[in-house]
Amino acid sequence: MSEETGAADTLTNGEDHLPQVALIAQYVKDLSFENPSAPGIYQAPEQPKIDVQFNIGSQQAGEDVYEVALKIEIKATQGDLTAYAVELVYAGLFGIRNVPEEHLPPFLLAEAPRLLFPFARRVAADAIRDGNFPSLVLEPIDFGALYMQQAEQQTALAESQPAGEA
């Protein structure tokens, strides 16, 4: 009788060698809503100009655990007045095991933010709506394309520097 090999062999002594990624928790790390021009801003007839900025950061939070933070800054202005300003840091803890080191940056800076963004978008929209402004629906973002664009820019910059300079 031949011995069967399979999933049991990969679990020697309780260890699994297959890549594993799991979202452990997601949370609002920081949230600020400012309405500095109230109450006069509510009488302004024009629509505010909206400026949205994003930033993504990641750091190791423990063994096989990484925190990914999506920072969203939204500022609405009407002329010289600030209608509102929202600063949100929405984060997630990801358990990552048996993933090659070269695959971590694409996951942490592209895939993880893609998973967090819908929830961060809702938190920002709720804060704006609760400030008595029309809810702002942020368009989906292709974090993968942004990651690739930034990686290409870094590669081009590195190639443009003469050898020996840092």
From Swiss-Prot:
GO terms for cellular component: cytoplasm. Keywords: Chaperone, Cytoplasm, Protein transport, Translocation, Transport. PANTHER family: PROTEIN-EXPORT PROTEIN SECB (PTHR36918:SF1), PTHR36918. NCBIfam families: PRK05751.1-3, secB. GO terms for molecular function: unfolded protein binding. It is found in: Cytoplasm. This is Protein-export protein SecB. Belongs to the SecB family. Homotetramer, a dimer of dimers. One homotetramer interacts with 1 SecA dimer. One of its GO terms (biological process) is protein tetramerization. One of the proteins required for the normal export of preproteins out of the cell cytoplasm. It is a molecular chaperone that binds to a subset of precursor proteins, maintaining them in a translocation-competent state. It also specifically binds to its receptor SecA. It comes from the Bacteria. The gene is secB.
